[in-house]
A protein has these predicted regions:
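An anion/pyrophosphate-binding glycine-rich loop and adjacent beta-alpha core
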Residues: 1-68
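Internal hydrophobic alpha-helix adjacent to the cofactor/substrate pocket in enzyme cavities
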Residues: 17-28, 144-161
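Structural signal for hydrophobic packing residues in well-ordered secondary-structure cores
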Residues: 45, 85-92, 152-159
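A glycine-rich dinucleotide-binding beta-alpha-beta segment and adjacent secondary-structure elements
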Residues: 64-138, 145
Length: 161
């Protein structure tokens, strides 16, 4: 997974994150010519197109094509993915094998937008409190739970009599 912040893409629109996401999805579609683009991890690290699957095969459903995923992502995402895969490889045997198969692209691990809230967690409408992953304040179940706990504490403090 790669972390992307508003500083990583152009535009001041509240939907600029969605535009960035869609641009990556279009690149993946083009790279795969409508099929799922696949690449061996060793080829990904070396920025060369995969020409054959190695010792690790894929169980992906649907049609795929061998590709170069570097053509899809900006450099900061490529570097982040390599760093993350290498870190996992130190903990999980074979995770970073050169023949490991990568596919592209999953772009929805977290909300591409963030609903703004004030110091009391309210949106621009008092009492309407955006929270968790869908509101852009979490990236998974644990951080969403923590955000929910913060919101709950604020509600108790301000609304519980």
């Amino acid at each position: 997974m790669a972390w992307v912040t508003p500083n990583d893409f152009d535009g001041d629109s509240p939907l600029a994150g969605i535009d960035f996401q869609r641009a990556l999805e279009r690149k993946a579609y083009k790279e795969g010519a409508g099929l799922v683009p696949l690449q061996k991890y060793g080829d990904f690290k070396n920025n060369v197109k995969t020409t054959d699957l190695g010792t690790i095969t894929t169980n992906i459903k649907g049609k795929y094509t061998l590709s170069n995923l570097n053509n899809i992502f900006p450099n900061f995402i490529v570097e982040s993915l390599i760093e993350g895969i290498e870190a996992f490889g130190k903990r999980i045997e074979h995770f970073n094998d050169d023949d490991a198969v990568l596919s592209a692209i999953e772009t929805r691990t977290s909300s591409p937008i963030r609903i703004t809230r004030d110091e009391n967690f309210n949106s621009n409408i008092k009492g309407l409190i955006p929270a968790g992953e869908g509101a852009g304040y979490a990236g998974g179940i644990t951080s969403a739970a923590i955000d929910g706990m913060k919101i709950f504490e604020e509600i108790i403090k301000n609304y519980w009599v």
